[in-house]
């Protein structure tokens, strides 16, 4: 169980970081 929970947390963190970077690049290109 702990491994699945940690894996899900890592996946969620990676998805959040990716979305933040994508939004940042979009804003930079928009400017």
Curated annotation (Swiss-Prot):
Q: Which domain of life is it from?
A: Eukaryota
Any single GO CC term annotated in Swiss-Prot or TrEMBL for this entry = cytochrome b6f complex
Provide this UniProt record's keywords sorted from A to Z: Chloroplast, Electron transport, Membrane, Photosynthesis, Plastid, Thylakoid, Transmembrane, Transmembrane helix, Transport
**Topology term for the membrane:** Single-pass membrane protein
The GO biological-process annotations, alphabetized, read as: photosynthesis
Keyword Membrane listed? The answer is yes
- Acetylation recorded as keyword: no
Which terms does the record give in the GO molecular function aspect? electron transporter, transferring electrons within cytochrome b6/f complex of photosystem II activity
Assign the protein's first listed, main location to one coarse class: plastid
Biological role stated in the UniProt entry: Component of the cytochrome b6-f complex, which mediates electron transfer between photosystem II (PSII) and photosystem I (PSI), cyclic electron flow around PSI, and state transitions. PetL is important for photoautotrophic growth as well as for electron transfer efficiency and stability of the cytochrome b6-f complex.
Q: Which family does it belong to?
A: Belongs to the PetL family.
HAMAP family, per this entry? Cytb6_f_PetL
- Put simply, this protein is called Cytochrome b6-f complex subunit 6
